[in-house]
Amino acid sequence: MTWDEKFNELFNRCFSAYVNGNSDFMSYYTPNDREFLASIGYKPRELFDFVEDLADEGLPAKSTALLVAAVRRDYFLTIQSGKTSPRAISRSDVPSFSETFEGFAYLPRIVAKAEAKLRGELDPDMMFGCGGDRKFLRENGEINPADFLRHVWAAAGDLSKVTEFVKKQNTTPPAAASS
């Protein structure tokens, strides 16, 4: 079975457990499941966040969860040589919701979260692809979260390059920061 088939099978099993009333996501995983998640650079909470949001909000789609996992896996195996980072980025380490860059509210925050997602450094209480991230991506050209991650990876820390990508996707002017 390929890694993506394993991911989909695990996602389906976790989704079923959650919609049937089990919110203890750590109970979803066997030792083999945890080993599999580690092999793709994923943490148990990362998968659960996508399961929970799909069950509770109808978004993001399972295919989005797989695409995001594919980007993380590629980064983990290619850039990190299969070695996890010991660092954890918390809410206080990322820019605020209202911080802007070149007129784009939230852009510095979502880029910081995307960079941490790529490195596997997001605190378990943070999610790349949360409602705020989805809102930003939707309002700026219906950008798929996995595409955004790949562009953040390619930008190699250059926020201007990410901004140019967002501008090309966006057919409306940037939303002003709300106070």
What are these regions (language model features)?
Residues 1-124, 157, 162, 166, ...:
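Polar/charged low-complexity regulatory segments
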Residues 37, 122-166:
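Amphipathic alpha-helical packing elements
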